[in-house]
């Protein structure tokens, strides 16, 4: 994907667009990097803690979650809350059932604030995620467009 320079998921038209010229670089760029595991980690500001967190953009994921890594870093934010839900998560190693706490979550990306009204926070997991949040396809599709610029390493939603 990197040789393409820039791609745009246009959800209004249900198209993947590779523009002839790059979108001008915004002031917040760069806001993502490629991890040693070859994942693209997007830098978000977490509305709960106010800190920067790493999100993995996964167009194949069926939903957005806050990972066990996030939970461990922010356990004090969930004092008095009990994991009342569970989630079946499938991956290369098979299927795991993990305990979750459903929350409303606010984050800032590219200077804009967004809210997910009901996403799970994984409180126990056998996986060692390298990121705090996984952004899945439903979150991406909630916006008109999602632009990824590989040349200057930035991502953003357009509404």
Model-derived features: where do they sit?
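Pepsin/retropepsin-fold aspartyl endopeptidases
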Residues: 1-159
């Amino acid at each position: 994907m990197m040789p393409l320079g820039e791609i745009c998921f246009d959800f209004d038209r249900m198209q993947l667009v590779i523009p002839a010229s790059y979108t001008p670089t915004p002031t917040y760029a760069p806001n993502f990097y490629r991890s040693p595991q070859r994942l693209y980690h997007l830098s978000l500001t977490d509305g709960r803690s106010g800190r920067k967190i790493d999100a993995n953009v996964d167009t194949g994921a069926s939903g957005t979650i806050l990972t066990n890594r996030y939970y461990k870093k922010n356990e004090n934010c969930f004092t008095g809350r009990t994991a009342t839900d569970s989630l079946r998560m499938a991956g290369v190693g098979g299927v795991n059932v993990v305990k979750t706490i459903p929350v409303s979550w606010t984050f800032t990306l590219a200077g804009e604030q967004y809210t997910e009204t009901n996403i799970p926070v994984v409180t126990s997991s056998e996986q060692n995620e390298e990121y705090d949040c996984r952004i899945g396809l439903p979150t991406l599709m909630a916006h008109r467009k999602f632009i990824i610029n590989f040349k200057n390493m930035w991502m953003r939603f357009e509404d």
